[in-house]
Amino acid sequence: MCGGAIISDFIPPPRSLRVTNEFIWPDLKNKVKASKKRSNKRSDFFDLDDDFEADFQGFKDDSAFDCEDDDDVFVNVKPFVFTATTKPVASAFVSTGIYLVGSAYAKKTVESAEQAEKSSKRKRKNQYRGIRQRPWGKWAAEIRDPRKGSREWLGTFDTAEEAARAYDAAARRIRGTKAKVNFPEEKNPSVVSQKRPSAKTNNLQKSVAKPNKSVTLVQQPTHLSQQYCNNSFDNSFGDMSFMEEKPQMYNNQFGLTNSFDAGGNNGYQYFSSDQGSNSFDCSEFGWSDHGPKTPEISSMLVNNNEASFVEETNAAKKLKPNSDESDDLMAYLDNALWDTPLEVEAMLGADAGAVTQEEENPVELWSLDEINFMLEGDF
């Protein structure tokens, strides 16, 4: 024993401090083979045993597996098979309920068949078109109007059928007969498809003017102004170029014509008149309280060779003693109203034939200057 030499036969070499499965379960390999279970190979690969025989024994144990064990292990693994087409043989087995054991194609076909059945049984969330249910149970209907580019609210209804019918009515109104509705068998005749109005129709509607209900002022006709504005009564209105539009009355009611002969071939002419226009008092001039009032006279000139004058008079009104000349005026009026027709013609200054020839008014009594002269004392 020189220098601390160690006798190899006396002291055994040191072993690994790691405990392996073989020291605890010496019959582990046999039990795995009997139960067809695979042992953990990771411990064998990472075994740090220095013994060459132990390593060789582990390698030998790994190669001891049979082919049957491999088949049993891989049968339980679910394969990932992606097939695009179906085989007729496999579809026949699926339809008859016979499945190939261990065939991934059969499992894939079964899953696709189940999905097809679910999709066929699946229903729409809303059975009707254009409606949706509120959280509190009501049904709302709305439709998209392509002309406006927005959704049109149709309202809230108690049942889904009412909301669907409201959608159908709006769809027929917007799209006409091409609309997709919930109840195609029901046709509502009252709902008429409204087409978009054309620009031409809009222009025609805008061009139609509304009637004016207010009183309009029209210009006096030229032929009337030439015929009837020459007398003293019409001269008082000579400076007025407009008058209120009144209903037209034919001149044969008042006996005023335009140079007609005895045959009466000329047609009737008309002029504007108003109620109370035959009264010759001063009420229309603005000083009715001061001027004398005359009775109403309705005159008619007969178109024949002999001029006759028909009068309808009322009782003479009392005159107010507002001027010194009221007595003379009253006597003048009494003579003018109650005398014979010949005296009336003499008072007017011409007979009926002269009136027709000179185109003057036969009922001219006095001019506006005479009225102003009589009323100077009051003003």
From Swiss-Prot:
Q: Which GO terms describe its biological process?
A: ethylene-activated signaling pathway; regulation of gene expression; response to hypoxia
Entry keywords, A to Z: Activator, DNA-binding, Ethylene signaling pathway, Nucleus, Transcription, Transcription regulation
What induces this protein's gene, according to its Swiss-Prot or TrEMBL record? Up-regulated by darkness, ethylene and Botrytis cinerea.
Q: Where is the composition biased (Polar residues)?
A: 190-206
Q: Name one GO cellular component term.
A: nucleus
> What PROSITE patterns is this protein classified in?
AP2_ERF
**So which tissues is this one expressed in?**
Constitutive in flowers, leaves, stems, and roots.
Question: What Gene Ontology molecular function terms does this protein carry?
Answer: DNA-binding transcription factor activity; transcription cis-regulatory region binding
Q: Which residues bind DNA?
A: 127-184
| Pfam families associated with the record | AP2
Alphabetized InterPro entries for the sequence:
AP2/ERF_dom, AP2/ERF_dom_sf, DNA-bd_dom_sf, ERF_plant
State whether keyword Calcium applies: no
The answer to whether UniProt assigns keyword Nucleus to this entry is yes
Q: Which SMART domains match?
A: AP2 (SM00380)
Location(s) in or outside the cell: Nucleus
Effects seen without this gene: Lethal when homozygous.
Q: Which portions of the sequence form the region Disordered?
A: 185-208
Show the CDD domains listed in the entry: AP2
| Major place of residence | nucleus
Assembly: Interacts with MED25 and SINAT2.
* UniProt family annotation: Belongs to the AP2/ERF transcription factor family. ERF subfamily.
Q: What does this protein do?
A: Transcription factor involved in carotenoid biosynthesis regulation. Binds to the 5'-ATCTA-3' element present in the promoter of phytoene synthase (PSY) and phytoene desaturase (PDS). Involved in ethylene response and resistance to necrotrophic pathogens. Acts as a downstream regulator in the ethylene signaling pathway. Partially redundant with RAP2-12.
What name does UniProt use for this protein? Ethylene-responsive transcription factor RAP2-2
Query: Which species does this protein come from?
Result: Arabidopsis thaliana (Mouse-ear cress)
